[in-house]
């Protein structure tokens, strides 16, 4: 019994002097562990007489309980002390200025798209959307693009299979609309389009807005006036020189491309306009009769007017960006300028 009480006395002294949780763990191992002093005494009970064994076992277990209680109390005290030290070390100086939340903003392409859409909606255009994965009929055939046309080549178009492609323009949306909606029609079709091209002025994915008017009295003069008004409103220039040059597109006849006087040098000639003083901004024309026939619209009764605008192109000109790829690199230093 004297040995047992001595173990308890030593444990009390050690627990009282313990400075951290590791000290307590060392004591627990030395006294209560598998090879601890009390465990060894319990294993030796078999050597005692039947009369001594119960009393000794009871005494050892009582000492064990007392030590466990002392350990638990001391552990709680040490944990509280450690927590107080942590609070002191991590205290917050409430006098420091607060951290401002980083404000997000729209991407310049989204800003440009919204601006273009709002200008056309004010002119009674309806915004329509369509699938980005198209079949050859909607992307090529219905738009009077023959099978031998270079635009159908593998090096220009992304093919899923022989008949399925990533759309190369948003014109298929116009065909789908005309299948469901009879004239008069006045729509714009914005969205992503895909072509196999990558340099400072081209990316494999870019954005377009294509417009379509189908009505009995539509004419090219009407289209020309509409686009001139749009360009002047977009660039916020009441006086903006615009010229139309003859061009060729399979889905329009006649076809034209519109140039504006360089907004960088005011027509004097610079690197952006390649010293020409003019910048190409869009393509347009009168819808080819074959396109109207593909959706069962009589080209003798109705006339279609179409135009296509590259959103990145207009964004580059408005914001003075000289490399198209900057729009897609997700560099916060670049994007922050447009907030």
Curated annotation (Swiss-Prot):
GO terms for biological process: phenylalanyl-tRNA aminoacylation. The keyword Repeat does not apply. Binds 2 magnesium ions per tetramer. One of its GO terms (cellular component) is cytoplasm. InterPro entries: aa-tRNA-synth_II, aa-tRNA-synth_II/BPL/LPL, Phe-tRNA-synth_IIc_asu, Phe-tRNA_ligase_II_N, Phe_tRNA_ligase_alpha1_bac, Phenylalanyl-tRNA_Synthase, tRNA-bd_arm. The keyword NAD does not apply. It catalyses: tRNA(Phe) + L-phenylalanine + ATP = L-phenylalanyl-tRNA(Phe) + AMP + diphosphate + H(+). It is an enzyme of class 6 (ligase). One of its GO terms (molecular function) is ATP binding. CDD domains: PheRS_alpha_core (cd00496). Its cofactor is Mg(2+). Keywords: Aminoacyl-tRNA synthetase, ATP-binding, Cytoplasm, Ligase, Magnesium, Metal-binding, Nucleotide-binding, Protein biosynthesis. Its EC number is 6.1.1.20. Its main location: cytoplasm. Pfam families: Phe_tRNA-synt_N, tRNA-synt_2d. Mg(2+) binds at residue 253. It is found in: Cytoplasm. Tetramer of two alpha and two beta subunits. Belongs to the class-II aminoacyl-tRNA synthetase family. Phe-tRNA synthetase alpha subunit type 1 subfamily. This is Phenylalanine--tRNA ligase alpha subunit. It comes from Ruthia magnifica subsp. Calyptogena magnifica. The lineage of its organism: Bacteria, Pseudomonadati, Pseudomonadota, Gammaproteobacteria, Candidatus Pseudothioglobaceae. The gene is pheS.
């Amino acid at each position: 019994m004297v040995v047992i009480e001595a173990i308890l006395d030593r444990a009390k002294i050690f627990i009282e002097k313990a400075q951290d949780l590791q000290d307590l763990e060392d004591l627990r191992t030395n006294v209560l562990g598998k090879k601890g002093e009390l465990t060894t005494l319990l294993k030796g009970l078999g050597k005692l007489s039947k009369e001594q064994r119960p009393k000794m076992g009871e005494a050892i277990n009582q000492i064990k309980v007392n030590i466990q209680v002392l350990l638990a109390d001391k552990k709680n005290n040490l944990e509280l002390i450690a927590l107080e030290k942590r609070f002191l070390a991590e205290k917050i100086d409430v006098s420091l200025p607060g951290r401002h939340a980083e404000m997000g903003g729209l991407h310049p392409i989204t800003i440009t798209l919204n601006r273009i859409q709002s200008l056309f909606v004010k002119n009674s255009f309806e915004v329509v959307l369509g699938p980005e994965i198209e079949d050859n009929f909607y992307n090529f055939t219905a738009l009077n693009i023959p099978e031998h046309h270079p635009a159908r080549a593998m090096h220009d178009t992304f093919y899923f299979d022989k008949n399925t492609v990533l759309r190369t323009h948003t014109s298929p949306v116009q065909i789908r609309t005309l299948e469901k909606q009879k004239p008069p029609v006045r729509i714009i079709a914005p969205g992503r389009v895909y072509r196999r091209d990558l340099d400072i002025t081209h990316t494999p994915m870019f954005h377009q807005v294509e417009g379509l008017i189908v009505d009995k009295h539509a004419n090219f003069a009407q289209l020309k006036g509409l686009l001139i008004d749009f360009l002047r409103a977009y660039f916020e220039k009441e006086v903006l020189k615009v010229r139309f040059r003859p061009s060729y597109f399979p889905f329009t006849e006649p076809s034209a491309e519109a140039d504006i006087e360089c907004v960088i040098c005011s027509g004097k000639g610079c690197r952006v306009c390649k010293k020409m003083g003019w910048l190409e901004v869009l393509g347009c024309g009168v819808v080819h009769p074959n396109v109207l026939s593909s959706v069962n619209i009589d080209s003798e009764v109705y006339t279609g007017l179409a135009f296509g605008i590259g959103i990145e192109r207009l964004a580059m000109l408005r914001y003075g960006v000289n490399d198209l790829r900057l729009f897609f690199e997700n560099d916060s230093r670049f994007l922050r300028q447009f907030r």
